[in-house]
Structure formats: structure tokens, C-alpha cells
Amino acid sequence: MEAVGERGLSVYLWRMVALSILDLSPVTTATPPAAALNNTLDLARFADRLGFTRYWLAEHHNLPTIASSAPDIMIGQVAAVTKNMRIGSGGVMLPNHAPLMVMERFKVLEALFPGRIDLGLGRAPGTDQITSLALRRRQDTTNEQDDFLDRFQEMILFETNGFPHNHPFSKVAAMPTGVPLPPIWLLGSSDYSAQLAAQVGAGFSFAYHFSDFPPEIPMLAYRNQFKRSAWRQTPHAILGVAAIVADAESEADRMATSADLHFARRALGQYGPLASPDEAAAYPYTPIDRQRIEHNRKRLIVGSPTQVHEGIAALAESTKADEVMITTMVFDHAARKHAYELLAREFELKKPLRLSEFDGR
């Protein structure tokens, strides 16, 4: 390969990966939850024209900062107002749901939007223990790992007609029949999830945007240990990254102060809508608050388009990511749209990479 400068290397690396969006439907002190959900539809329409490959919706419960609690419903709404991007869950928290119900909802989505739906599954409840109990209506909410494995295996047995003849579920069909389950992705923030995704032959998405785990370890472990399956012939690893970009570094840093304050308050058990940069500037931070913010900033890419480009490209190279999925939590919806516009322009997105390259089939 010909020698290239730092900027040229960044562009060269980027051409090897796709760029996608994870939308949490952020709630702010100026944006109530209903408006946040409508902002998601607005951003999805906008992103679909910019050339992003995927648009995923999250499942979180009882979090005042996030309106995204029902990703399957939002997927249908987003898919209906877009035409290019793959739309999926990032993810459905499987311990909260009956596997058959998850399958049927996503088969319906696949039937309505064939070839455009992704089923991302998470192992955590996406909430606190009390809310988890309210969701599941059972007393034991501590054995989530084993529960996930049981539910995931049940889902696979339904899809493959793998239940023994004498099993009561052998007579149950996930409807609509004749419609395949969308490509499965396992989400995680540690090497355990990466190893599990590799063993079952699923796609893998690593949540670096909230994990302290070095991303290179799980991302490379997944790729090295991947086993082909009926779902996927080759590994596909997505790196989830939190990024805030503006025309100038100073403006991006100002926008990021909303996330700084949210992180400082969350560490104290104080949850609320995302505050404005002005409120964040007036907050009386303690030395411990500032230490926590500094630590969190290490995994948050903030800056001008060029700076964010370099940061993302470096992570994509070190983790060998096939795709980078960006989440941007800022106070102003227009600023969030502009951030993705800047990313699309900086990375020279023209149109989404061909869906057949990423559907796992």
C-alpha cells in the first residue's frame, strides 16, 4: 500500500467499515418523552438521506433521560418513514420478554419490511432491579445470565423446529409462518457476550459507549472464535461509540457538558432529563465530580468533524470493526441532526453500503 498521511490513513481505514446510528430518543428539560419519540422519526428520515447503513432503537425502562422503551414498536414506525437503512433493535432485552413473543413481533416486522430488519438481543434488563421485577413479575431477578441463555436457546429451537417430538412447544409455530427471523445480533459490554456471539454464529455489537472494558479484547475475541451458523457465514462486529461533533471543537465541547452533568448526577443516583449546556455550566461540580467526568470523557469522542473522524477511525482499526454505530446524546435536537450531517459529510457517505453485505445471509 502506498504511504499516506495521517488524514489519508483515516479516510483509508474508514472505507473498510460502515457507519450507523443508535438512537436512545433522548429526553431533555426542554423535550418531553413524546416529543423525543417524534424527534427519533425526524432524525431517522434525515439519516436515511445521508447514507447511514443501520438505525437501531434501544430498550430502557424507568430512565428519565431515555424515551426508548419499546424498540419493536419504534422499529415499525422508523421503517415506515425510511427506505434505505436497515432498522433494528439495539437491543431487545430478552430477559424481559417471552421468546415466542419477541420472535412473532420481529417476524411481523420482517414480513412488512423484508430484508431491512435486525434483531439485536441484550442480556441485561435495561433498568434497575425494582423495575425489572415489575417487568417480569417474578422474585428471582439475579440469575440474568442463565435466564438469557435459556430464552435464547428456546428462540432458536422455535425457529429451527428443534424441540423434541414429545415437548409441548413442538406443536407451537411462531407466526407468521414462512417468514424468517431477521438476522440476530448479540449485544454486550464484555468479553463474555463476544464469546457467546461467536459460539452461536451471530453478529456482535459491543457497547463501548458505556463500557469500561477495553473494546479490542471482545471485538477481536469474537472475530477469532466465530463459528459459522445457519444465521451467519462470516463474523460481523459492530463497535458502539458515543460521539459529539460540531463545526468547531469548542462548540462540541460545550454540547458535551450536558452529558458531563448527566454522568456526574447519575454517579450520585440522581436521574433526570438531559440538562442544557447553560445549566451544566452553572452546576457546582465537586473535585470528585470532575474526576468522574474526566474518566467518562475517555470513551466519549468530542470535537470537530476531523477530530471525531480520526478518533473513530483509530478505534475501528484497533478493534477491526466491520461497522461503527454512533450514539449522540445532546440537548438540542437540531444540533444532533447537524452532528450526523457533519459525520456523513466528513466520511463522504453517499448511500448505505449494500444491505446484502450486512444481512448475515
Where are these regions (language model features)?
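Active-site mouth loops of central-metabolism enzymes
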Residues: 23-38, 92-100, 178-188, 296-304
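N-terminal beta1-alpha1-beta2 module of alpha/beta enzyme domains
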Residues: 7-85, 356-360
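Acidic (Asp/Glu)-rich catalytic clusters
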Residues: 48, 75-83, 110-116, 196-199, ...
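Conserved, mostly hydrophobic/aromatic
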Residues: 19, 51, 59, 78, ...
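Structural preference for beta-strand elements that scaffold enzyme active sites
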Residues: 18-21, 53-54, 84-91, 116-120, ...
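An alpha-helical appendage that flanks or caps ligand/catalytic pockets
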Residues: 140-173, 214-320, 348-361
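A conserved active-site cap/scaffold subdomain adjacent to cofactor or substrate pockets
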Residues: 192-213, 219
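Flexible, glycine-rich active-site loops centered on histidine and acidic residues
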Residues: 17-33, 95-162, 204
